A protein has these predicted regions:
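Conserved short "hinge" loops at termini or chain/domain junctions
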Residues: 1-59, 110-138
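Amphipathic alpha-helical interaction surfaces
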Residues: 38-46, 63, 67-75
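Short loop/turn elements at secondary-structure junctions
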Residues: 67-138
Length: 138
C-alpha cells in the first residue's frame, strides 16, 4: 500500500462524513496515516511498512487513521468537528421491498457521545481482518 493512496482515501472518506479537509489538516492526516500503517504492520508482523499491507486491509487502515485523526481534532480543535453529520444513523433496514429507516433525532445521546461512539467504531473496525492477516514472528 502506498502512503499517498492512503492519504487520498482518508481525505475522500472524511468528505463523505461531511468534514472539509483544510491545508492545516494535511500534516496531521499524514502523521495519522503513517501511525495507522505502523499499527497495522506491528499488529500483523509485516516487515516492510506500509508496502506489506495487503489491499484487503486498506480500508481497515484508513478507518483507523480517520479515528485517530478525529480523536486528535476532538482533543485539540473540537470546534472544527461541528460540520460532521452524526445524526444520520441507520436504525432499520428491511430487505424485502427495501425499507430503510434512519434514526434522525432519536435517542438522548449528545453530539459528543455520538462522536465518541463513532471514533471508537473507526478505531476498532476490522479486528477480524487484522487477525486473518497476522503472521507469526520468529
Amino acid at each position: 500500500m502506498i502512503l499517498a493512496d492512503m492519504i487520498r482515501l482518508i481525505n475522500l472518506r472524511l468528505q463523505m462524513f461531511g468534514y472539509t479537509v483544510t491545508e492545516v489538516d494535511s500534516s496531521t492526516i499524514e502523521y495519522q496515516a503513517e501511525k495507522a500503517a505502523q499499527y497495522v504492520c506491528n499488529f500483523c508482523n509485516f516487515n516492510k511498512c506500509p508496502d506489506d499491507i495487503p489491499g484487503a486491509l486498506k480500508f481497515v487502515t484508513v478507518d483507523y487513521a480517520i479515528g485517530e485523526f478525529l480523536e486528535h481534532k476532538k482533543t485539540f480543535a473540537p470546534n472544527t468537528l461541528s460540520m460532521l453529520n452524526l445524526d444520520m444513523a441507520v436504525k432499520q433496514i428491511k430487505a424485502g421491498d427495501m425499507d430503510t429507516t434512519f434514526a434522525v433525532g432519536e435517542g438522548s445521546k449528545t453530539h459528543e457521545q455520538r462522536l465518541d461512539a463513532f471514533i471508537n467504531y473507526l478505531k476498532s473496525y476490522g479486528k477480524t481482518e487484522l487477525m486473518r492477516h497476522r503472521r507469526i514472528k520468529w
